[in-house]
């Protein structure tokens, strides 16, 4: 699979759990793309969206996106605009802010995400959020769960997951989606032959 990693505010592909995740995914044979988003301390949403566009070109059905924090909102705006070769397999949003009432982040929330468009841009949406996140409260994940008809994966502790160097739930989520269609049916139907 092709896995695209989108970091968040004041971060980079070389911080937090991203280096560990990149290495672990490559060891499993995945193609990993991890763009460095510009001006992470003073971000402008469209600049992040444009960088994602240049890094990915046209996502397809074998693509999985994993984003953290403010990078989740940039990813959703990217998906609104994206020209796709197929519907990405999964969109995994970690500690995603639904709204932040701050002028500094206005470009990410005005205009708001068009959920009616975005919900068709992924085969499934998965929200990963720690219950004790003091930066982006847990109820933000519940809002995304409703708007995207997503699956919410709760983590008991970890805060905003900025100081975490490994996040094993992400590998579990990828492994669960890395199956070849028909693998589970092989034994049950191996003796059936269709004659036309």
Set out the residue ranges of the language-model regions.
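Conserved alpha/beta-hydrolase "acid-adjacent" motif
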Residues: 134-140, 163
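Gly/Ala-rich beta-loop-alpha elbow adjacent to hydrolase catalytic centers
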Residues: 65-76
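Catalytic histidine-centered segment of alpha/beta-hydrolase-like enzymes
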Residues: 43-44, 158-171
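Active-site nucleophile loop of the alpha/beta-hydrolase fold
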Residues: 8, 37-40, 91-101
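Short beta-strand/loop motif that positions the catalytic acidic residue
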Residues: 121, 126-129, 133
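Conserved alpha/beta-hydrolase fold motif
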Residues: 64-66, 91, 127
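Active-site catalytic motif of lipid deacylating hydrolases and related acyltransferases
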Residues: 1-61
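Short glycine-rich catalytic loops that host catalytic nucleophiles or stabilize transition states
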Residues: 35-38, 153-159, 164
């Amino acid at each position: 699979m092709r896995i695209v990693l989108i970091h968040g505010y004041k971060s980079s592909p070389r911080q937090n759990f991203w280096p560990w995740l990149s290495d672990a995914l490559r060891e499993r044979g995945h193609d990993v793309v991890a763009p460095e988003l510009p001006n992470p301390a003073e971000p402008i949403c469209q600049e992040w969206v444009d960088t994602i566009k240049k890094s990915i070109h046209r996502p397809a059905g074998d693509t999985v996106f994993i984003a953290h924090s403010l990078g989740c909102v940039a990813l959703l705006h990217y998906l609104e605009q994206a020209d796709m070769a197929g519907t990405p397999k999964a969109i995994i949003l970690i500690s995603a802010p639904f709204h932040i009432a701050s002028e500094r982040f206005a470009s990410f929330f005005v205009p708001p995400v068009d959920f009616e468009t975005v919900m068709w841009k992924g085969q499934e949406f998965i929200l990963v959020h720690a219950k004790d996140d003091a930066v982006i409260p847990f109820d933000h994940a519940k809002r995304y769960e409703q708007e995207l008809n997503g699956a919410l994966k709760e983590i008991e502790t970890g805060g905003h997951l900025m100081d975490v160097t490994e996040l094993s739930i992400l590998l579990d989520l990828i492994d669960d989606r890395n199956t070849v269609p028909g693998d589970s049916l092989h034994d049950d139907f191996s003796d059936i032959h269709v004659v036309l």
